[in-house]
Amino acid sequence: MKFLCILLLASLAATSLAILNEPEDETHLEAQPTDASAQFIISNLQISTEDLSKEPSISREDLISKEPNVIRSPRQPQNQNPKLPLSILKEKQLRNATLGSEETTEHAPSDASTTEGKLMELGHKIMKNLENTVKEIIKYLKSLFPPASEVVKP
């Protein structure tokens, strides 16, 4: 089993290195169809050289030279002091108060009368159900794999 894993990883590494070392012009990612009808469809979809001559060609250098030399972050700048909504602050306070116990405590009736209180209650119920579901899934997955003492070498 270990030998198979090592061969698989070596094959993956060799393939990755081979693809990385090829120039971009030589990289072939298309699968070659063996069916005659599939080859006919692909041959119809290919663009003739006459159509290519009509299109203006843009070299890679042209694309690079037109781009500004500014590096931008894809993320928005984060505010150092974010303003949290009141419901999130209340939820954090409730979590800190019930940190020692796993069971959720019942909220005061005044909290349940507001929509924020109702949303918090639903959120806590969903979180509790999700935690139970995750625990059951992990327990099931652990039961699928035999303990190390039961594994027999071939």
From Swiss-Prot:
Pfam families: GLYCAM-1 (PF05242). Glycans are attached at residues 34, 96. It is a peripheral membrane protein. One of its GO terms (cellular component) is membrane. Keywords: Glycoprotein, Membrane, Phosphoprotein, Signal. InterPro entries: GLYCAM-1 (IPR007906). The modification Phosphoserine is found at residues 48, 53, 57, 59, 65. It is found in: Membrane. Residues 51-115 are annotated as: Disordered. This is Glycosylation-dependent cell adhesion molecule 1. It comes from Capra hircus (Goat).
